[in-house]
UniProtKB/Swiss-Prot annotation:
Location (main, coarse): mitochondrion
Gene behind the chain: RRG9
InterPro entries: NGRN/Rrg9
Organism: Puccinia graminis f. sp. tritici (strain CRL 75-36-700-3 / race SCCL)
Protein name per UniProt: Required for respiratory growth protein 9, mitochondrial
Membership in a protein family: Belongs to the RRG9 family.
Amino acid sequence: MNSSTIRRSIGLTGSLARQKRVNRSSPLPAAQDPQAGPSGSKAVTEEAPENRLFNHSQEQKDEDKPQWLIHKEALRRKFPDGWNPPKKISRPSMALLRTLHQTDPNQFSLSILSEKFKISPEAVRRILRSKWEPNQETAKKTEQRQQTVGAAHSSDGWVHHEKLETDQIPLNLAHTLQSSLPSSSKISSSSFPRKSQPRSSYNHFKK
């Protein structure tokens, strides 16, 4: 064997030895490191009891709170911008709404009435389906309350009271509004003052 062949074999052997030393000195990846697995799982198992303790303590705090406070906090979470209930209309407005729908259901549909009275279509549907009517005592109390807050005292005063809600209703339905008024509020012919007789006829009967 000549000297060149010997040097070539020694060089190959040295390179293989150096490669083995490099492989032994390089650390294993985190996924293949046998010691990394138990430590990672241990960290995960250590977080779980802390979360359970926190949730348990939170539940105990909620149980110690009064029911009204729990309900109030739930409403705050549900309505972060505040509670804004839908608009409520008065009893005369409900009666007017039913009258308009009965007069012309096509013209005064749910969407049109919802736009005119500034309420939701679902509220209009519920009002039309409702058959409840106030008794005389309730109607009297409602009338007194309206008079207290400054409602008009004329026969069609409640129509003017609802002017803001019905200002876009066509004027040709004035007879419908008048017919929907309570019978007690309509002006009877007996309420007009009697005409005074001529003075000549009075003298004739005096004779």
